[in-house]
């Protein structure tokens, strides 16, 4: 049994906390929001983010970051990408040398063009940073539906340790040393999913969606390989797998936001309607900047930026 804290109590953090708890680990969930923590502790259910999914009595909840971080075997960082750097900075004083932090969010920082793991390493240099990614909607993981993901880490030892911690009968975990490729696939697919959703909102058919997914992964792979990612990463679970589920699923907030824009909503109206973080909106500008920096043609990413910021 490991002692684990999940930093961030959104839908994905809640689903992973439940998975880890079912695996027999001692799990604490942290949120900066006192009302959210009180509600979770009392109701044992996140009714706004993961309704109908009950949390065990053994799970603990806190707003005390020091208490959440210190003495834990590993930490799961599950805050929205725009809060990754700030949260990591606040965690830093309490993180022990070599303590494992698994980032499970997806995004690229617009100002620096850094991936999330790079931001965490920047703020917490003493940590052993890993990532978890793949086609995995929180709603399905919370319900115990079969899911397959990949853990990326710098060392095989860390990757295999996390594989053992997360793996269950319904949650299969592969390992990869290609953290950069995994993170690029996970963040850039959100931008392509906005395009796929917009096509749905405009009433276009399956032919259009198939084209967007296929040409979308080609764009992602071109950039990712130029930046140093491995080709097989983009044609595996954390590339095409994640892209398919995000472009096609009813659970996908990026697809839903795109769908609403296709129906005539503005970006702001669509984001308000979705009521959860739409990571693709925050990654779109960064994706365009990366394409220019590395001189890679990404026409879908270009058009998404035009729809979002010039429409």
Annotate each predicted stretch with a short phrase.
Residues 55, 62-70, 74-146, 162:
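Rossmann-like NAD(P)(H) cofactor-binding subdomain of soluble oxidoreductases
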Residues 70-71, 188, 240:
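Alpha-helix C-terminal capping/helix-to-coil transition sites in glycosyltransferase folds
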């Amino acid at each position: 049994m490991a002692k684990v804290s999940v930093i961030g109590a959104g839908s994905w953090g809640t689903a992973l906390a439940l998975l880890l708890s079912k695996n027999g680990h001692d799990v604490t969930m942290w949120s900066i929001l006192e009302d959210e923590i009180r509600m979770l502790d009392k109701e044992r259910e996140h009714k706004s983010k993961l309704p109908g999914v009950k949390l065990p009595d053994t799970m603990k909840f806190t707003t005390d970051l020091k208490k959440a971080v210190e003495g834990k075997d590993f930490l799961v960082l599950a805050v929205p990408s725009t809060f990754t750097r700030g949260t990591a900075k606040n965690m830093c004083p309490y993180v022990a040398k070599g303590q494992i932090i698994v980032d499970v969010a997806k995004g690229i920082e617009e100002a620096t063009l850094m991936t999330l793991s790079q931001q965490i390493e920047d703020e917490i240099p003493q940590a052993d940073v890993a990532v978890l990614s793949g086609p995995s909607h929180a709603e399905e993981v919370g319900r115990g539906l079969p899911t397959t993901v990949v853990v990326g880490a710098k060392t095989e030892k860390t990757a295999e340790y996390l594989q053992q911690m997360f793996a269950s009968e319904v949650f299969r975990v592969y390992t990869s040393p290609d953290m950069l490729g995994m993170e690029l696939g996970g963040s850039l697919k959100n931008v392509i999913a906005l395009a796929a959703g917009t096509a749905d909102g405009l009433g276009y058919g399956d032919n259009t969606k198939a084209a967007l997914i296929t040409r979308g992964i080609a764009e992602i792979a071109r950039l990712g390989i130029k930046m140093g990612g491995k080709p097989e990463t983009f044609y595996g679970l954390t590339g095409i797998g994640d892209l398919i589920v995000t472009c096609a699923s009813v659970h996908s907030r990026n697809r839903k936001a795109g769908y609403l824009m296709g129906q005539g909503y503005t970006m702001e109206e669509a984001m308000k309607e979705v009521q959860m973080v739409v990571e693709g909106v925050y990654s779109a500008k960064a994706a365009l900047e990366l394409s220019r920096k590395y001189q890679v043609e990404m026409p879908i990413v270009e058009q998404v930026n035009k729809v979002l910021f010039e429409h």
